[in-house]
Design a protein with these regions (language model features):
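PLP-dependent class I/II
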Residues: 1-252
Length: 252
């Protein structure tokens, strides 16, 4: 289903419903999102849940960035809605909020019939997560959360720095992401495809971007930028991107 720049890339029930067919069994939702960082509000999640009830569908909610939000109380899980127990499959993990990328540790809450089948699949593929990784996960959940708060404060500063810097570059427009660590600026004014723009920035500015088209046709005209780096690196990247964009503006 499409996400629209005009509403900050938030999911809309009407866009999802337009694509439901008699063969549809599952809706996949993601909030906060990769690549946009957008967060879908509770009222819109309720509308999506109502769709699932109307068409008797499961909902798979990927909430890997649920702890990575920039406004207190902003995140809302669709699994917290009434009657969600038998319809929502919720997944989460440790790689983002606890900086445990590569540990391959996560969790799922699902209706019993789904959970039982997932257990069968797990047992015949990887058996289980190694014991020391499980202990690390317990320490992450039960331990002092101050490092997580400090990390998010740093991400907030980096987000603000990057988005403000992008919006100061003529020809680029960028929404302020509500979560995760991605920005998804609109670069369509330069007359290049997102892949051409990303290739040019890598070649001329030594800045690595991901073409929005990698995320589907709706991403054309956008690029994804990650601010999981130092403020000094972000400033340097902005200066280089701005220089190339100024050169492009002279040609458009």
């Amino acid at each position: 289903y499409p996400l629209h720049d005009s509403n900050g890339f938030r999911m809309r029930a009407e866009d999802i419903e337009a694509l439901i067919t008699p063969r549809t069994r599952l809706l996949i939702i993601h909030s906060p999102q990769n690549p946009t960082g957008a967060i879908t509000e509770p009222e819109h999640l309720q509308e999506i849940f109502d769709l699932a009830e109307k068409y008797d569908l499961y909902i798979y909610s990927d909430e890997i960035y649920s702890r990575m939000v920039y406004e207190e109380g902003h995140f809302f899980s669709i699994a917290s809605l009434d009657q969600s127990r038998e319809r929502v499959i919720l997944s989460n993990g440790f790689s983002k909020a606890f900086a445990m990328t590569g540990w391959r540790l996560g969790s799922v809450i699902a209706p019993r019939v789904i959970a039982e089948r997932m257990m069968m699949l797990l047992q015949t593929t990887s058996s289980c997560v190694s014991a020391f990784v499980q202990r690390a996960g317990i320490a992450a959940i039960e331990g002092d959360q101050a490092p997580v708060r400090e990390m998010m404060a740093a991400y907030r500063r980096r987000r603000n720095l990057l988005v403000q810097g992008l919006n100061n570059i003529p020809g680029i427009k960028c929404h302020l992401p509500g979560g995760a660590f991605y920005a998804f600026p609109n670069i369509s004014s330069f007359g290049l495809s997102s892949e051409e723009f990303a290739d040019l920035m890598l070649e001329k500015a030594n800045v690595a971007l991901l073409p929005g088209s990698n995320f589907g046709s709706q991403g054309e005209g956008f690029v994804r930028m990650v601010y999981a780096s130092s403020e000094s690196n972000i400033k340097r990247a902005l200066e280089r991107v701005a220089d190339v964009c100024h050169q492009l503006s002279g040609r458009v």
